[in-house]
Amino acid sequence: MNWTEDFKDNSIYRIDESTRMIEIAFAKASETQIWKRPNKNSNSIGNLILHLCGNMTQYVIASLGEQEDKRKRDEEFETTNGLSKAELLSKLKKTVANVKSTIENASETQLLKKRSVQGFSFSGMGCVIHAVEHYSYHTGQIAFWAKQLTDQQLGFYDGMDLGINNKD
């Protein structure tokens, strides 16, 4: 395996892990709770999903995939309802599928090419790294807020022995 395939595989693995965790958190929260904000300066789970879709589309699908950037970032935070849990999850899954396809199909040239996103200069790899870490960061916020709203464990690793030591 060469470095580009390893980079792609590991990036997609992290995206899939975050998606799995978001699906678990979503299953615990009600339709009403999805749009509840902790306070006026914080985002609901619904807003975070819209924001993640916008960010991943901008950084991976548009930038790495060399498509037109049509993101309307402010709308991601201004929305207060109107989409159900099923609609939000469908939007997220479609975005993630497009992101994964874009990463899988990216050439070495695309991964190394410098580009401007939100006024920052990144290589294609930099765009993927940003999208993956940003997705993970907000996945943690979604998990925390779902646990706060429902007073339930999410059990991300139930049934797994996480005490196994690393081996070469």
What does each of the following model-derived ranges do?
Residues 80-115, 125-135:
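Acidic/histidine-rich alpha-helical segments that form the ligand environment
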Residues 9-10, 69-87:
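Short acidic-aromatic linear motifs embedded in glycine-rich loops, typified by GG[WY][YF]DAGD(H)
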Residues 28, 51-54, 94:
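Residues within well-ordered alpha-helical secondary structure of globular protein domains
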Residues 15, 19, 26, 92, ...:
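Hydrophobic alpha-helical core bundles mediating ligand binding, dimerization, or RNAP-core interactions
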Residues 1-14:
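Extreme N-terminal tail/first-helix region
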